[in-house]
Protein backbone atom coordinates (compact mmCIF):
# COMPACT_ATOMS: atom_id res chain seq x y z
CA UNK A 1 0.00 0.00 0.00
CA UNK A 2 1.02 3.64 -0.29
CA UNK A 3 1.31 6.39 2.26
CA UNK A 4 1.87 9.60 0.37
CA UNK A 5 4.39 8.64 -2.30
CA UNK A 6 6.36 6.19 -0.16
CA UNK A 7 5.63 2.46 -0.70
CA UNK A 8 5.08 0.54 2.51
CA UNK A 9 4.53 -3.00 3.72
CA UNK A 10 1.04 -4.16 4.65
CA UNK A 11 0.78 -5.27 8.28
CA UNK A 12 -1.80 -7.86 7.22
CA UNK A 13 -0.12 -11.01 5.89
CA UNK A 14 -3.26 -12.73 4.64
CA UNK A 15 -7.01 -12.26 4.84
CA UNK A 16 -8.96 -15.36 5.88
CA UNK A 17 -12.51 -14.36 5.08
CA UNK A 18 -13.39 -11.59 7.53
CA UNK A 19 -10.34 -12.32 9.70
CA UNK A 20 -7.00 -10.59 8.99
CA UNK A 21 -3.83 -12.46 9.94
CA UNK A 22 -1.21 -9.92 10.95
CA UNK A 23 2.52 -10.18 10.37
CA UNK A 24 2.96 -9.24 14.03
CA UNK A 25 1.56 -12.55 15.21
CA UNK A 26 3.38 -14.56 12.55
CA UNK A 27 6.71 -12.99 13.48
CA UNK A 28 6.17 -13.49 17.22
CA UNK A 29 5.24 -17.12 16.55
CA UNK A 30 8.35 -17.62 14.43
CA UNK A 31 10.51 -16.27 17.25
CA UNK A 32 8.91 -18.67 19.72
CA UNK A 33 9.41 -21.70 17.45
CA UNK A 34 13.04 -20.90 16.67
CA UNK A 35 13.72 -20.28 20.35
CA UNK A 36 12.08 -23.60 21.22
CA UNK A 37 14.22 -25.40 18.65
CA UNK A 38 17.38 -23.87 20.11
CA UNK A 39 16.40 -24.73 23.70
CA UNK A 40 15.36 -28.34 23.00
CA UNK A 41 18.58 -28.95 21.09
CA UNK A 42 20.74 -27.72 23.97
CA UNK A 43 18.49 -29.33 26.55
CA UNK A 44 18.93 -32.78 25.01
CA UNK A 45 22.70 -32.29 25.08
CA UNK A 46 22.50 -31.60 28.82
CA UNK A 47 20.14 -34.46 29.61
CA UNK A 48 16.83 -32.58 29.56
CA UNK A 49 14.08 -34.55 27.75
CA UNK A 50 12.90 -32.85 24.57
CA UNK A 51 9.30 -32.64 25.72
CA UNK A 52 10.33 -30.62 28.79
CA UNK A 53 10.78 -27.39 26.86
CA UNK A 54 7.83 -28.16 24.59
CA UNK A 55 5.60 -28.49 27.65
CA UNK A 56 7.12 -25.38 29.22
CA UNK A 57 6.51 -23.29 26.10
CA UNK A 58 2.91 -24.48 25.80
CA UNK A 59 2.29 -23.22 29.33
CA UNK A 60 4.64 -20.25 29.53
CA UNK A 61 3.86 -18.53 26.22
CA UNK A 62 0.13 -17.95 26.88
CA UNK A 63 0.89 -16.79 30.42
CA UNK A 64 3.71 -14.54 29.21
CA UNK A 65 1.38 -12.98 26.63
CA UNK A 66 -1.24 -12.44 29.33
CA UNK A 67 1.28 -10.75 31.63
CA UNK A 68 2.72 -8.72 28.75
CA UNK A 69 -0.73 -7.41 27.92
CA UNK A 70 -1.67 -6.76 31.54
CA UNK A 71 1.57 -4.85 32.06
CA UNK A 72 0.92 -2.72 28.98
CA UNK A 73 -2.71 -2.04 29.84
CA UNK A 74 -1.87 -1.02 33.43
CA UNK A 75 0.48 1.70 32.26
CA UNK A 76 -1.93 2.82 29.53
CA UNK A 77 -4.98 2.59 31.76
CA UNK A 78 -6.25 6.08 30.94
CA UNK A 79 -6.86 4.93 27.37
CA UNK A 80 -8.17 1.45 28.14
CA UNK A 81 -10.52 2.70 30.85
CA UNK A 82 -12.27 4.60 28.08
CA UNK A 83 -11.94 1.75 25.57
CA UNK A 84 -12.34 -1.50 27.56
CA UNK A 85 -13.19 -3.51 24.46
CA UNK A 86 -9.64 -2.93 23.23
CA UNK A 87 -8.01 -4.57 26.25
CA UNK A 88 -8.08 -8.01 24.63
CA UNK A 89 -7.14 -6.76 21.15
CA UNK A 90 -3.48 -7.73 20.77
CA UNK A 91 -3.49 -8.45 17.04
CA UNK A 92 -1.83 -5.15 16.28
CA UNK A 93 0.60 -5.00 19.19
CA UNK A 94 0.51 -3.71 22.74
CA UNK A 95 2.62 -6.36 24.46
CA UNK A 96 5.29 -5.26 26.94
CA UNK A 97 8.40 -7.43 27.04
CA UNK A 98 9.06 -6.82 30.73
CA UNK A 99 5.57 -7.98 31.60
CA UNK A 100 6.03 -11.09 29.50
CA UNK A 101 9.35 -11.79 31.19
CA UNK A 102 7.75 -11.58 34.62
CA UNK A 103 5.07 -14.05 33.58
CA UNK A 104 7.61 -16.40 32.01
CA UNK A 105 9.85 -16.44 35.10
CA UNK A 106 6.96 -17.13 37.46
CA UNK A 107 5.77 -19.93 35.20
CA UNK A 108 9.28 -21.33 34.88
CA UNK A 109 9.78 -21.46 38.65
CA UNK A 110 6.49 -23.29 39.22
CA UNK A 111 7.08 -25.61 36.25
CA UNK A 112 10.60 -26.54 37.41
CA UNK A 113 9.37 -27.26 40.93
CA UNK A 114 6.60 -29.51 39.63
CA UNK A 115 8.96 -31.38 37.29
CA UNK A 116 11.67 -31.71 39.93
CA UNK A 117 14.36 -30.00 37.86
CA UNK A 118 16.55 -27.00 38.58
CA UNK A 119 14.93 -23.72 37.56
CA UNK A 120 18.38 -22.21 37.06
CA UNK A 121 19.36 -24.99 34.68
CA UNK A 122 16.22 -24.46 32.61
CA UNK A 123 16.71 -20.68 32.72
CA UNK A 124 20.32 -20.93 31.54
CA UNK A 125 19.38 -23.18 28.64
CA UNK A 126 16.46 -20.94 27.71
CA UNK A 127 18.36 -17.63 27.95
CA UNK A 128 19.68 -17.53 24.35
CA UNK A 129 16.27 -18.70 23.12
CA UNK A 130 14.44 -15.91 24.93
CA UNK A 131 16.81 -13.30 23.52
CA UNK A 132 16.49 -14.80 20.04
CA UNK A 133 12.72 -14.55 20.31
CA UNK A 134 13.01 -10.93 21.37
CA UNK A 135 15.36 -10.14 18.48
CA UNK A 136 12.93 -11.63 15.97
CA UNK A 137 9.86 -10.24 17.70
CA UNK A 138 11.00 -6.64 17.25
CA UNK A 139 10.35 -7.07 13.53
CA UNK A 140 6.69 -7.42 14.42
CA UNK A 141 6.93 -3.87 15.76
CA UNK A 142 8.51 -2.91 12.45
CA UNK A 143 5.55 -4.25 10.50
CA UNK A 144 3.15 -2.42 12.82
CA UNK A 145 5.16 0.81 12.54
CA UNK A 146 5.39 1.05 16.32
CA UNK A 147 8.14 1.18 18.96
CA UNK A 148 9.99 3.76 16.88
CA UNK A 149 12.11 6.72 17.96
CA UNK A 150 12.15 10.45 17.40
CA UNK A 151 11.76 12.18 14.07
CA UNK A 152 14.69 12.04 11.65
CA UNK A 153 15.24 12.87 7.99
CA UNK A 154 15.33 10.40 5.14
CA UNK A 155 18.92 11.49 4.57
CA UNK A 156 19.77 10.38 8.12
CA UNK A 157 18.30 6.92 7.50
CA UNK A 158 20.04 6.62 4.15
CA UNK A 159 23.27 7.53 5.94
CA UNK A 160 22.83 4.38 8.04
CA UNK A 161 22.92 2.39 4.77
CA UNK A 162 19.57 0.79 5.51
CA UNK A 163 17.63 -0.98 2.75
CA UNK A 164 14.76 0.97 1.24
CA UNK A 165 12.06 -1.26 2.71
CA UNK A 166 13.15 -0.31 6.24
CA UNK A 167 13.49 3.38 5.41
CA UNK A 168 10.08 3.43 3.74
CA UNK A 169 8.40 1.64 6.64
CA UNK A 170 9.79 4.28 9.00
CA UNK A 171 7.79 6.90 7.10
CA UNK A 172 4.71 7.33 9.28
CA UNK A 173 2.06 9.98 8.70
CA UNK A 174 4.43 12.15 6.69
CA UNK A 175 7.45 11.87 8.99
CA UNK A 176 10.52 9.60 9.15
CA UNK A 177 11.48 8.08 12.51
CA UNK A 178 14.42 6.37 14.20
CA UNK A 179 14.17 2.58 13.58
CA UNK A 180 14.64 1.75 17.25
CA UNK A 181 13.18 -1.70 16.63
CA UNK A 182 16.25 -2.37 14.47
CA UNK A 183 18.73 -1.08 17.04
CA UNK A 184 17.29 -3.35 19.71
CA UNK A 185 16.95 -6.31 17.37
CA UNK A 186 20.60 -6.10 16.33
CA UNK A 187 21.69 -5.69 19.96
CA UNK A 188 19.73 -8.81 20.85
CA UNK A 189 21.16 -10.85 17.97
CA UNK A 190 24.68 -9.94 19.13
CA UNK A 191 23.60 -10.97 22.63
CA UNK A 192 22.50 -14.39 21.36
CA UNK A 193 25.96 -14.93 19.88
CA UNK A 194 27.54 -13.83 23.18
CA UNK A 195 25.39 -16.19 25.25
CA UNK A 196 26.12 -19.12 22.94
CA UNK A 197 29.84 -18.40 23.30
CA UNK A 198 29.56 -18.15 27.10
CA UNK A 199 28.06 -21.64 27.21
CA UNK A 200 31.54 -22.93 26.49
CA UNK A 201 32.98 -20.97 29.42
CA UNK A 202 30.85 -23.16 31.70
CA UNK A 203 29.65 -20.43 34.04
CA UNK A 204 28.09 -21.24 37.37
CA UNK A 205 24.48 -22.31 37.14
CA UNK A 206 22.09 -19.39 36.80
CA UNK A 207 24.72 -16.92 35.66
CA UNK A 208 24.04 -17.31 31.95
CA UNK A 209 20.46 -16.27 32.63
CA UNK A 210 21.62 -13.27 34.66
CA UNK A 211 24.02 -12.36 31.85
CA UNK A 212 21.04 -12.36 29.51
CA UNK A 213 19.14 -10.03 31.83
CA UNK A 214 22.10 -7.66 32.09
CA UNK A 215 22.83 -7.64 28.35
CA UNK A 216 19.22 -7.08 27.35
CA UNK A 217 18.64 -4.44 30.00
CA UNK A 218 21.70 -2.36 29.06
CA UNK A 219 20.63 -2.26 25.41
CA UNK A 220 16.99 -1.61 26.25
CA UNK A 221 17.90 1.28 28.55
CA UNK A 222 19.65 3.22 25.80
CA UNK A 223 17.20 2.32 23.02
CA UNK A 224 14.26 3.29 25.22
CA UNK A 225 15.69 6.79 25.53
CA UNK A 226 15.10 7.25 21.79
CA UNK A 227 11.52 6.01 21.73
CA UNK A 228 8.44 8.19 21.54
CA UNK A 229 5.90 5.64 22.77
CA UNK A 230 7.43 4.65 26.10
CA UNK A 231 5.18 3.52 28.92
CA UNK A 232 5.49 6.26 31.53
CA UNK A 233 5.05 6.64 35.28
CA UNK A 234 5.11 10.37 35.80
CA UNK A 235 8.38 11.60 34.28
CA UNK A 236 9.98 8.14 34.30
CA UNK A 237 10.21 5.71 31.41
CA UNK A 238 9.10 2.41 32.93
CA UNK A 239 11.35 0.30 30.70
CA UNK A 240 14.42 2.27 31.77
CA UNK A 241 13.54 1.89 35.44
CA UNK A 242 13.00 -1.84 34.94
CA UNK A 243 16.27 -2.14 33.04
CA UNK A 244 18.27 -0.51 35.82
CA UNK A 245 16.51 -2.68 38.37
CA UNK A 246 17.23 -5.90 36.46
CA UNK A 247 20.92 -5.06 36.09
CA UNK A 248 21.28 -4.31 39.80
CA UNK A 249 19.27 -7.36 40.88
CA UNK A 250 21.21 -9.65 38.53
CA UNK A 251 24.58 -8.48 39.85
CA UNK A 252 23.40 -8.83 43.45
CA UNK A 253 22.09 -12.35 42.79
CA UNK A 254 25.37 -13.41 41.18
CA UNK A 255 27.41 -12.13 44.14
CA UNK A 256 25.08 -13.39 46.88
CA UNK A 257 24.59 -16.85 45.35
CA UNK A 258 28.35 -17.31 45.09
CA UNK A 259 29.01 -16.18 48.66
CA UNK A 260 26.24 -18.39 50.05
CA UNK A 261 27.41 -21.42 48.10
CA UNK A 262 24.22 -21.61 46.06
CA UNK A 263 26.04 -21.48 42.73
CA UNK A 264 28.54 -24.30 43.08
CA UNK A 265 27.26 -26.30 40.11
CA UNK A 266 28.39 -25.35 36.64
CA UNK A 267 26.29 -24.79 33.54
CA UNK A 268 26.92 -28.22 32.03
CA UNK A 269 26.65 -30.25 35.25
CA UNK A 270 23.67 -32.49 35.91
UniProtKB/Swiss-Prot annotation:
The transmembrane segments are 19-39, 56-76, 92-112, 116-136, 178-198, 206-226, 236-256
Q: Which domain of life is it from?
A: Bacteria
**Topology class, membrane:** Multi-pass membrane protein
Tell me one GO molecular function of this protein.
phosphatidylglycerol-prolipoprotein diacylglyceryl transferase activity
- Which residues of the sequence carry a binding annotation for a 1,2-diacyl-sn-glycero-3-phospho-(1'-sn-glycerol)? 138
* Chief place where the protein resides: membrane
Q: In which pathway does it act?
A: Protein modification; lipoprotein biosynthesis (diacylglyceryl transfer)
Q: According to the UniProt record, what class of enzyme is this?
A: transferase
Q: Name one GO biological process term.
A: lipoprotein biosynthetic process
Which controlled-vocabulary keywords does the entry list? Cell membrane, Membrane, Transferase, Transmembrane, Transmembrane helix
The reply to whether Cell division figures as a keyword in the UniProt entry is no
> So what EC number does this one have?
2.5.1.145
- Cell compartments where the protein resides: Cell membrane
Summary of the function given for this chain in its UniProt record: Catalyzes the transfer of the diacylglyceryl group from phosphatidylglycerol to the sulfhydryl group of the N-terminal cysteine of a prolipoprotein, the first step in the formation of mature lipoproteins.
Provide the family line.
Belongs to the Lgt family.
What's this protein's name?
A: Phosphatidylglycerol--prolipoprotein diacylglyceryl transferase
Amino acid sequence: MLLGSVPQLDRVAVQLGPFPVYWYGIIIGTGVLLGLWLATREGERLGIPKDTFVDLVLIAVPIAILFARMYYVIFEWEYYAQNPSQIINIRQGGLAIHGGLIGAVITGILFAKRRGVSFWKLADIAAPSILLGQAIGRWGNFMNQEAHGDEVTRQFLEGLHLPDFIINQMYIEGVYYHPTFLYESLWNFVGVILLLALRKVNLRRGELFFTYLIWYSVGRFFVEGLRTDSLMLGPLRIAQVMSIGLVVISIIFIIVRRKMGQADKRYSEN
